Amino acid sequence: MTEEQEYWRAETVAFYALQSLHGVGFRTLYKIAVQGTKFRELIKTEDPKHFGKTLRITLPTSIFNSEEEWNNFKKELWAKGTSIARTYSQIDVKVVFFDQDAFPNRLKSINEPPMWLFVQGNLKNLHTNSVAIIGSRKASDDGYWLTKLIVAGMANKGLVSVSGLADGIDQRAHIESIRFGVPTVAILGTGIDSNYPKGSETVREQILSCGGTIVTEYLIGQSYSGHNFVQRNRIQAGLATSVIPVEWKIKSGTAHTVNFAKDFNRFLVMPYLPDSNLEGSELQAITSYRKGKIFQVPDQTNDLVNFIKNPLIEESEESPTVDLSNGERQISFDL
């Protein structure tokens, strides 16, 4: 093991150890990481007061009365982190930190980037040109057909699909990707140990067995929430070269992803059927964006597929005005 590998192995153990402490949650660890403090250095500290204050937890009184007690506490905590790290390593779960070369460059440049990623499966997929395919949980037959068309058009083109493993369009994007041999990445809104939504275990197993990847920034044991899903959507948009909202409403979770795509200067692509209302809010949200393109299918299927493979807009790439208010899109970690 190289010195660099040993460094990040220790950081991973420390990260697992700290999140095992009662009262230590995502926001606390995120703030620590943003400030540039390394987790292993925090565990090494000789000052229990600094340790407790930084993590916003109350330590047992005995720890402050004896150096031996403090050292024993740290040794036990490190052993706990080592055990957790070993457990997740056995199921091919890695932690990739923001400062590592293995961290996706596309996510380093977004607003409020993840400071770490739990990655299960093929890490290479996070460094390959990818297309986020997103949409309604209550999809129609038309939505499923459009999803199949898009993914089939991505086959054998060196692209990766990205979605959120949710019911509806998301799961169909993963399933069609598996069918057509397109590597697929599922971004979770929960901890890596959680199977959500209920019944998604089979799709998740298929994703991994076919060379895909499961990704989340959330901690072990962390459950879902509406706020978490909005934050998850920024990772979908950030990781992708192009974002394709297949079937959605302007007031929906998918709309958050659309607006993140605009914030991050990604391409937005939307296929539509001949009977669609071109004045509808959803299509207008795409056409009003300088890097947005819509395609009527089946007539423009070839143009759609070619654009997905090689997106190009011969216009200025100025940042557009987003469609949702700041309050509706708020993702701040309240640091």
Where are these regions (language model features)?
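Short, small/acidic-rich helices and loops at N termini and domain boundaries
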Residues: 1-99, 287
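Glycine-biased, small-residue-rich flexible motifs in mid-sequence functional cores and linkers
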Residues: 2-9, 98-335
